[in-house]
UniProtKB/Swiss-Prot annotation:
Pfam families: AnmK (PF03702). InterPro entries: Anhydro_N_Ac-Mur_kinase, ATPase_NBD. ATP binds at residues 12-19. Belongs to the anhydro-N-acetylmuramic acid kinase family. The keyword Repeat does not apply. This is Anhydro-N-acetylmuramic acid kinase.
Length: 374
């Protein structure tokens, strides 16, 4: 078992930064030791947003984006090493999720695409990288997502308490940790993605800090109901989605039937959409005693309050209360998945993704052995 220090790197669908986490991991323990949030340059963020919404690129432009993201991830790792005064030889491996630019697990040729050249990360950090975590699961008939429920189960499952873990990133996803039942999990729909897209277009702000703008508005019930009629919400699990589906174009199509709405009312309605679609899935699954929230949305007081109101009898809290920072959960999960890969252990849960079997995930990009001085 490759016990030791691992680094997890995550750039999610919210594109609010690169999360980098340092953890000590073995078969009995995952202990977070440090973390860092590394900024994504505005121009690079926009390039990723454009490709996620279907903008065509030349092969040269696509290759450049792949390289630039790899360099960005390497810089983020090196930033953490410098912050903690560590050397490459102190780290067993990096688990890098990459940047998802397209996710299409259905259709004649199911696929998912995460970019950010792992070779650049190895070359610039001198540390072995484990990446490309999702495509093996898709090759086995799965959704390739979500992968984090396995980590949630390992750290947060309880023998008697009915728990669910909710990650609200760009997309929201649930992990259902119910005693005596197989772990299940799936994407419920948009998390922060549509709220962030709307305030960016209307106010040139990256996100609605403390939901201040949404709290000034009122929910437009006809608009909310129209959005809730989207077939994704009624589709059975396993299911997963992303920015290629729930994007600004999706929102614009719904707004065409409602001209003249106040912008703040649209924001309030999008916050309600996130809360309602999550709570409906919690209730459809039989409910839970405790809903533990992580991701950027855990800091949205309006969404958190609405979840509590829509789920009476459920304690709505954050994973911070269990000692795991909600901001670092996903990066920590991919550090753990890298450890599982190097240990030859399966990283997916077929009960979650729908894959035909559990499997070791990812590809290993080995670093050169340290040079010895003669």
């Amino acid at each position: 078992m490759r016990s030791g220090r691992y680094i997890g790197v995550m750039s999610g669908t919210s594109l609010d930064g690169v999360d980098v986490v340092l953890a000590a991991i073995d078969e009995n323990m995952v202990a977070q030791q440090a973390s860092l949030s590394w900024p994504i340059p505005v121009e690079l963020k926009q390039a990723v947003l454009d490709i996620c919404q279907g903008q065509q690129l030349t092969l040269s432009q696509f290759g450049q984006l792949d390289t630039r993201l790899g360099i960005l991830f390497a810089d983020a790792v090196n930033g953490l090493l410098a912050q903690e005064n560590l050397q490459p030889q102190d780290i067993v491996a990096i688990g890098c999720h990459g940047q998802t630019v397209w996710h299409e697990p259905q259709g004649p040729a199911p696929h998912t695409l995460q970019i950010g050249d792992n070779n650049q990360i190895v070359a610039r950090t001198g540390i072995t990288v484990v990446g490309d975590f999702r495509r093996r699961d898709i090759a086995l008939g799965g959704q390739g997502a979500p992968l984090v429920p396995a980590f949630h189960h390992a750290l947060l499952a309880h023998p008697t308490e009915r728990r669910m873990v909710l990650n609200i990133g760009g997309i929201a996803n649930l992990s259902m940790l119910l005693p005596g039942q197989p772990v299940r999990g799936y994407d419920t729909g948009p998390g922060n993605m549509l709220m962030d897209a709307w305030i960016w277009r209307q106010c040139a702000k990256p996100y609605d800090k403390d939901a201040q703008w949404a709290c000034e508005g009122n929910v437009v019930l006809p608009l909310l109901q129209q959005m809730l009629n989207d077939p994704y919400f009624a589709a059975p699990a396993p299911k997963s989605t992303g920015r290629e589906y729930f994007n600004y174009g999706w929102l614009e199509r719904h707004l065409q039937k409602f001209p003249g709405l106040r912008s703040r009312d649209v924001q309030a309605t999008l916050a309600e959409l996130t809360a309602v679609t999550i709570s409906e899935q919690v209730l459809l699954s039989g409910g839970c005693d405790r809903l533990m929230v992580c991701g950027g949305g855990s800091r949205n007081p309006l969404v958190m309050a609405r979840l509590a109101g829509l789920l009476p009898g459920t304690e709505v809290t954050t994973t911070d209360t269990a000692g795991i920072s909600g901001d670092d959960m996903e990066a920590l999960a991919f550090a753990w998945l890298a450890w599982r890969t190097l240990a030859g252990l399966a990283g997916n849960l077929p009960s979650v993704t729908g894959a035909s079997e559990a499997t070791v995930l990812g590809a290993i990009f080995p670093a050169n052995p340290p040079r010895t001085q003669s």
